[in-house]
Amino acid sequence: KTKADEAAVLIYTSGTTGQPKGALIPHRALIGNLSGFVCSQNWFGFDGVRNESSDAVFWSPADWAWTGGLMDALLPTLYFGRPIVGWNGRFSPELAFSLLQQHGVTHSFLFPTALKAMMKAYPHPRQQFSLQLRAMMSAGEAVGDAVFAYCRDELGVLVNEMFGQTEINYIVGNCSRYWPAKPGSMGKGYPGHRVQVIDDDGRECPVGVPGDVAVHRFDVHGDPDPIFFLGYWKNEAATRAKYTGDWCRTGDVAVRDADGY
């Protein structure tokens, strides 16, 4: 019988700070991703009062061979028993809007680069396409004011930015339904995770003091956080270097404000 802590998939990191490393992702990681997914998709069609099930339809151009496509799109959508639109072809703004319209897509994950291309090709898309969008997540780079305004005014959604990485995905972001986005911020720690800004010694930095974004091995309930990867494939030294005590470092520098952003 498969166990939660057994490896499910080997995903290589992007290698932005060195050679790509193979991160072993366990089966339990899907559960660890769900709170961020639900928040970034504005509850993904679940009302909590009027409806007990979701009617969401998901689409993203993110490839299903990496963390973004698997953990931010495909697997969470299937976990909730909802359809996800698949397309094996090159992205284009026309294709994107055609798929959104044809399949009545309600929720999506779109990169800022894709949104910029869509904005350039179709400044006023609802003049040509019937859109049913209710929520959208974006990640990979800063969305920026122009794209944020385009999503709000032309697509009819407040885009939720998200931050994570292959090893510990979906840890910080926004949820326009329950907390507003702040300019220049990537959001708050998603429910369940202990996310902090720490110094070189693993101590939590005071408000406004720069440090490394990190996630604690144990969640807010004191249980092992299921979001964590198992380690790097055949690279124990790199796995050890990822941690300071029970904190797993992202390698990204940030500051925290008094409201937790």
Annotate each language-model stretch with its function.
Residues T2, G184-G189, E204, K242-D246:
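Short Gly/Pro-enriched turn/cap motifs at secondary-structure boundaries
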Residues I31-H107, K120-A121:
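Conserved AMP-binding/adenylation subdomain of ANL enzymes
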Residues Y79, V105-L110, M119-A181, R194:
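Gly/Ser/Thr-rich phosphate-binding loop
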Residues T16, G81, G140, G164, ...:
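Conserved G/P- and acidic residue-centered "switch" motifs that form tight phosphate/ATP-binding loops
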Residues K1-Y12, Q19, F44-V57:
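Conserved pre-ATP/AMP-binding loop-to-beta segment of ANL
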Residues A8-S35:
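Conserved AMP-binding A3 loop
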Residues A214-Y261:
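Conserved ATP-binding/catalytic segment of the ANL
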Residues A7, T13-T16, F58, L100, ...:
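Conserved S/T- and glycine-rich ATP-binding loop of Class I adenylate-forming
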